């Protein structure tokens, strides 16, 4: 049983799978997070072919991934949704969460959580927040951005400054330990995932665990697990 999430690992994983199957009776199964990566490279397709054609069966977590997988392999595939997490603890009182994070409990908070990469659309969210502010619809609310930057953060800092959002965006640009995750989701009124591309997202499952409504974009598998108007809202990524 193997796990696959990026073509970068395909040369190694594909070789291991072929060696394992070389005895003629061992079957290789794969729990697959992504087929096509969020940031594309010329080697993605040949690397994917090398690994995925050496696998006897798959478990996928969204129909988006299943559709991409079918372009490479006709091996049996089983759907199993992304599970909820158990390692982040239980929801705490909002007042306690605000104290822990140094937040004003009188303010409403939107939360953008997790690794900050181009495809996650933080730039879209900042532009949208600026529009809300100009329209007078962001009064009494702030945006928490919590996570490590995997792309140069200077462009986002410029965007915040250019839009006059210095007092509207609370930036916790660091790794968030498991023990602190519950405070962010307990303090938030809703979670925002303005992704430009996606398959499925662990952030969505954390929001479910802590019973926090979501606003997500209609990309990849996000809309599959966030019914519009029931547990949140689905919008276009523009």
Describe these PLM feature segments.
Residues 104-120, 126-129, 143-144:
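Conserved donor-binding/catalytic core segment of Leloir-type glycosyltransferases
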Residues 142-155, 174:
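Glycosyltransferase donor-sugar binding loop
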Residues 228-229, 233-238:
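Conserved acidic donor-binding segment of nucleotide-sugar-dependent glycosyltransferases
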Residues 196-197, 203, 212, 216-223, ...:
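Short glycine-rich donor-binding/catalytic loop of glycosyltransferases
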Residues 53-92:
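Donor nucleotide-sugar binding/catalytic pocket of nucleotide-sugar-dependent glycosyltransferases
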Residues 183-201, 209-212:
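Acidic donor-binding loop of glycosyltransferase active sites
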Residues 89-103, 110:
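A short helix/loop element that forms part of the nucleotide-sugar donor recognition site in Leloir-type
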Residues 154-175, 179:
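Nucleotide-activated donor-binding/catalytic signature segment of Leloir-type glycosyltransferases, i.e.
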